[in-house]
Structures are given as structure tokens and as C-alpha cells.
Amino acid sequence: MPQLSASSLFICLWLVDLCHVANSVLSSSFSDLHTQFGISLYQTLTETENKSNLIVSPASVSLCLGLLQLGARGNTLVQLEGTLGYDVNDVRVQNILSRPQGDLANSSEGLRLQLANALFIQTGVKLLPEFTQHALGWGNTSLLSVNFSNPNHTHSRLQQWAHYQSKADDHLQTREELHHSSGEEEEATRQDHLLYMALVSTLVFHGAWQKQFLFTETQNLPFTFSDGSTVKVPMMYQSSEVNIGHFRLPSEQEYTVLELPYLDHSLRLLVALPSDRKTPLSQLEKQITARAVGLWDTGLRRTKMDIFLPRFKMQSKINLKPVLQSLGVSDIFSPSAADFRGISDTDGIFVSEAFHEARIEVTEAGTKAASATAMVLLKRSRSAVFKADRPFLFILRQISTGSLLFIGRVVNPADMP
């Protein structure tokens, strides 16, 4: 059965030598806030990333920033709240943020969604009990001890944990494994006060379409790049009734949005494509807003369509430090400004690096394609056609929360990792 598989990995390295809560009022539209953060994150990335395929998980990044927010104080907390748009200490926010895991983790209809965090703490660093309690209840968080003086061992542990989370089908690792010995604590304090912590967040998703793309219908068709050149790529096909809508950008250019639902209807993949082949995808990327995405909910209409969607697989590795700084989160990276007194009594904790890795694959199930299908595809019914044969934007969105699990662009489906 056709399915979409995705996973993301977010890593923060903290350099230790270690913000009062300004009570924020929860917005009446948490969905809009979540969407706004995701769009802002993506648009900031498009300003710095090259014109290649791109994918990011706003849900995963916001989960990590939320964990930081639990231990932030002063202006550090203000910046995190301002960027996310909400206060994770609000129980209503916590209930909403826990929905993705609760809604889908136990689905029996071809869906699997797993969210997990791990906070790797330098041996010898003592966490505050209150933070430990809150962290272990936040997004399936594990607290794990590691000696950062051995980089190879540390990297191996981070990768092993992330690999375990991406492969575990039935459960998530949520536990506390803090083991300190006096010798390890001594060693930790001898590192010129340079203690480390690492935060790893994973989001894994596998989903089956409500209506499958038959592997035997896939054929090689041209995909046109932004410069006008073409390449032949495996193009999936199906004819069915789907939700589709036509919208207009502030610059008056039109674009089309197609919705592909999953079996239990909790998630949907939205594909946005400029209607005019001469309109570059960058125009859509620059002008899309959270409000526009919200209007898609009411602007889509059920229509019989012939759908052509390229099979694609991509991976992005992103340095989030400049991106978050552009979004207004700067104190966490400053040794003098970062205020994480809610995490530990140890002075001088700040974030030195922040990386994000995301992967996605859209394909049909099956092991080999059939040939001689071009004539069949070219003689379909007279239904309207949606053909993603040029660069397009995609969003994997959860309906109940508005959370953008993934947002990205396909500019070259033939460029696969």
C-alpha cells in the first residue's frame, strides 16, 4: 500500500560554564500560532538555503524549544514565548501539544506517529528536581547521562538513541538514566568548566493513503525545473475524487492546493502548486501566510481529478542557529545572556549549536514497475488534471491541532539521498 514515511532529528549542543515568567495569555487560536511558527521557520530557511529540495519539521523544532522554555527564565523565556506564540507552562498548551502522540500513536489504520525527546546531560551536572519532573512528562522525554569528553562515544550514543526511536514500532523510550559517580563528577568539573548537554528530538511518521496509488500506474514523465530544463522521473497516478482549491497570492498570481488524506483522516498531505507554469515556486514561498493556510480548510472543494504526483525522497540537514536568531531567539546562544536557572543551579548554561535533520519519502508499495503504461495514462477520462510536474510545496498537517508536522518543497524529485 502506498505510504509516506518521515522522520526528523533535532540536536542541540549546549556549552556550560548556565529567564521570571511573564504570564502570557494563551491565544484563542492555537492552531494559527502553530501554523504561523511553522511558516515563519520555513520562510526563514528558504532565505538561507540553496534552491535544492528542502524539508523541516516545525512540530519537532517547537517541541525542543518548548522543552527549553520549561527551564528558561527572564528575557530568555520572553524570546522563546514570543517566537512560539505560547507559554508551555500553561496546562492547556500542554494538553494540545500532547495530542499528536495521543491521536495517532495507537492508530490501527496504517498510521504511526512517534514523538520523543532525549536530554543528554554531562556527567556531574545536577538538574533541578522540578525540571526533571516536568521534562520527563514533556513529549516522551528521556534524561540520559553521557561523558562529553569522549566525542566518539557521545556521538554514538546520540545516534543509537535516535536510531532506536526511528525503528521502535510499538513503544517509545521514556525514562530517566542519570547515573553519577564521584569520579565522573570530578572529571566533569575538570573540563575548564566546559560542561555539555545535548537535546535530541525525533518525530517519526508512516502513513497509508486513503486511496492507493497503484505501482503499475507509475511511469517516467518529464519534470520541469525552474530554469526550464527537464528530467524524467517516476510519476505516480490515480483518478479519484479529492479536495482541491484555487487561491490567489497578494501579488495576484494563482496557485492550486490538492489534499491527499490518510486512512483515519487525522492527517493530510497538502500539495501547493503555482497555477501558471511561468510563476516560480519562490513567489508562493515568500507570500504564503498562516492565514492563507487556514483558508485552505474552507476553500477546498470535492472534485474528480486525474492526479500525477512524483515519487520523491529527500533529506535535509540544517544549522538552526542562524534561523532561530533571525526569528528572535538569540539569548539561548549567548553565554552572558542565556538564563536557564530553571534547568540547573550550574552557572553559564547556553546553547552553542543547534542542528535539525529531517527525512521524507513518498512512494507506492511494491517492488517493480510495470512498463507500457504511458498510453493508458494519456487516455484517461476527461476529468480535471492536477499534475505536479514542476517545483511544488508540500505540508503534512494534523487536522485537530493545525500542527505542521512537516513542510517542504520538491524542486527535483530525481535528487534522492
Curated annotation (Swiss-Prot):
Cellular component terms per the entry's GO annotation: extracellular space
Pfam families (UniProt xref): Serpin
Transmembrane segments: none
Protein known as: Probable serpin E3
Role this protein plays: Probable serine protease inhibitor.
Gene Ontology molecular function: serine-type endopeptidase inhibitor activity
Signal sequence bounds: 1-24
SMART domains: SERPIN
Glycosylated sites: 50, 106, 140, 147, 152
Entries under PROSITE patterns matching the protein: SERPIN
Sites annotated Reactive bond: 380-381
Organism: Danio rerio (Zebrafish)
Stated family: Belongs to the serpin family.
Domain of life: Eukaryota
Keywords from the named record: Glycoprotein, Protease inhibitor, Secreted, Serine protease inhibitor, Signal
A GO biological process held by the record: camera-type eye development
Broad class of the protein's primary localization: secreted
Cellular localization per UniProt: Secreted
